[in-house]
């Protein structure tokens, strides 16, 4: 692992700490390999299903739910006829506390979004407007190159591979970036000397 002075952007925290340092970071960095392999496998398999059978996300969800409900329905019917126990299904209910907590979370984030939109519309923050405009432009550009399903699958694969790859080969990546930056700086200086030969004479 690189020392803190050699890390990209001179950061002091590790990749694991930047990603939150919890279970999500462990999964993204393949420290829980079974979970990571499962996520990547499901992502690739679902993408192949979507592409091979021309499924949409709604078609897949509807088909899975229909199959699941049919199995449970037939199981319950046969259990009542054959005097067998019914399928052990818990009762799914949303408690009042969960609903209240979700509504508070949603209200806070919607209010933040509305406040940001208001500040941009009133031209109060030019930097924020630039960031939002660039982000929306990039999203529009990406959306024109691929559909939503492909974007979701690609995003999951990127999230599951890039951080782990960077953490494992950080020394090589940082060294390559520094090499490219140095070569770019040398090229810039040569072009500057070529464009302004009087600077070379003065030096």
UniProtKB/Swiss-Prot annotation:
Pfam families for this protein: Reticulon (PF02453)
Gene Ontology BP term (one): response to bacterium
Annotated Gene Ontology cellular component terms: endoplasmic reticulum membrane
Bilayer topology: Multi-pass membrane protein
Annotated transmembrane regions: 34-54, 55-75, 132-152
Compartments, record wording: Endoplasmic reticulum membrane
Annotated keywords: Endoplasmic reticulum, Membrane, Transmembrane, Transmembrane helix
InterPro entries with a match to the protein in the record: Reticulon, Reticulon-like
Domain of life: Eukaryota
Domain Reticulon intervals: 24-203
PANTHER family: RETICULON (PTHR10994), RETICULON-LIKE PROTEIN B12 (PTHR10994:SF65)
Protein name: Reticulon-like protein B12
């Amino acid at each position: 692992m690189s020392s803190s002075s050699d890390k990209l952007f001179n950061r002091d925290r590790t990749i694991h700490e930047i990603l939150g340092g919890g279970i999500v970071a462990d999964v993204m960095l393949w420290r829980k390999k079974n979970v990571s392999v499962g996520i990547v496998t499901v992502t690739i398999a679902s993408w192949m299903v979507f592409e091979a059978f021309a499924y949409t996300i709604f078609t897949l969800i509807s088909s899975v739910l229909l199959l699941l409900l049919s199995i449970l329905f037939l199981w319950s019917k046969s259990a009542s006829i054959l005097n067998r126990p019914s399928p052990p299904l818990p009762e799914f209910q949303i408690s009042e506390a969960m609903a209240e907590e979700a509504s508070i979370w949603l209200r806070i984030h919607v209010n933040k979004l509305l406040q940001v939109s208001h500040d941009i519309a009133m031209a109060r923050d030019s930097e924020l407007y630039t960031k939002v405009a660039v982000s929306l432009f990039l999203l529009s550009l990406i959306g024109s190159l691929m559909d939503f399903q492909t974007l979701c699958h690609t995003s999951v694969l990127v999230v599951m591979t890039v951080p782990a790859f960077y953490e494992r080969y950080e020394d090589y990546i940082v060294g390559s970036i520094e090499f490219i930056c140095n070569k770019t700086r040398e090229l810039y200086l040569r072009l500057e000397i070529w464009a302004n030969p009087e600077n070379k004479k003065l030096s």
